[in-house]
Amino acid sequence: EPWLVKRPFTAEGLVERYLDDVFGLGPLEDMLSDESITEIMVNGSHSLFYEQEGKLYQAPHPFSDDGQVYALIDRIIGPLGRRVDESSPMVNARLPQGHRVNAVIPPLAIDGPVVTIRKFRSHAFSLDEMQDLGSFDKKIEQLLKWAVLRRCNIAVSGGTGSGKTTLLNALSAVIPFSERIVTIEDSAELRFSEHPHVVRLEARPKSAEGVGEISIRDLVVNSLRMRPDRIVVGECRGAEALDMLQAMSTGHDGSLTTLHANSPQEAVSRLATMVRYGAELPVAVIEAQIATAIDLVVQTTRYPDGSRGICEISGYVWNEEKRHCVVDRYYIRDTVTKESSWIKIPAWLDDLPYLGIAAAKEVAQWKQM
């Protein structure tokens, strides 16, 4: 059922509405508490949309004027010491629950202040739960678990809203409790409710005075001095890609990250571009490092019915003759029909018995699935 206003016009309901206005985020409180809603979009005072189970719905607009939307923005960013005004009309923030907020005001937002809230579940999905929901089958679930335990460097690639962060979180939950994890994010979204040894780092934007910025790249470089067993970067989107690839290639195996790309091949191009933000290296040199550093690229997608899942799993190999990083496809799933097929089996699966991760019989049974 699409979301409906849950505060009745009774004395008790009116008191709850008043308390929401004074202490919470006003008319958005009901949506924030509804676990089935994943995104809230306020387009000025005249338009409110939300995403529920992968589909967009329009809600009754609860704001009487733009002033209420401005008050909402101030309520969010005020405690963080941030501001939004004509000189700085865009801001990113995080709610105490971990939800990510983006606000844009005029003159950039022509029709009034815009607020977008990306919600995150209080309980992170496990690989088991994602498999139960149909994001992938049991064969892929087992492959992903083995890949994490084998300390493969994994990049989760996908478009906006395709479930990259959800999958990254589920993969991270497989990391053994005996290992020290350092997570690095632009806005903290990953959740490690059970792992006993997690250090969470969050980038810091410039202050209102234009100083004090700490970038993802700064944190990646610093994390190498923190004795990490695993480095998890929420999303590679800039010059930090160079340091991430170097870390993956020089002993910090088992690292995880996400990339905004629509295919594993596009991910190579995106990574090469990002590396060049930080160093003027030849493309062939960069692609050779990508082929060396990344063991597995998992492509996520959003299907036409609104569901999310894995549509491709690949590796990378270096083609010396063409001086090019080539996608080595293992598995594909059609993004329309959802029909899937295995093209080949990753060679590293045969290492698992020798590493004590899985018995030879288990691997053989997996190949027959």
Label the predicted regions.
Residues R121-D132, L149, A173-V221, A267-L271:
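P-loop NTPase switch/communication element
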Residues V156:
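Hydrophobic anchor at the beta1->P-loop junction of P-loop NTPases
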Residues D305-M369:
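NTP-binding/hydrolysis catalytic cores, primarily Walker-type P-loop NTPases
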Residues E1-Y57:
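N-terminal anchoring/assembly modules that precede and organize ATP-driven motor systems
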Residues E185-S187, R191-H195, V199, S223-W318:
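Conserved P-loop NTPase nucleotide-binding/switch module
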Residues D34, S47-R150:
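P-loop NTP-binding catalytic core
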Residues K164:
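Conserved lysine of the Walker
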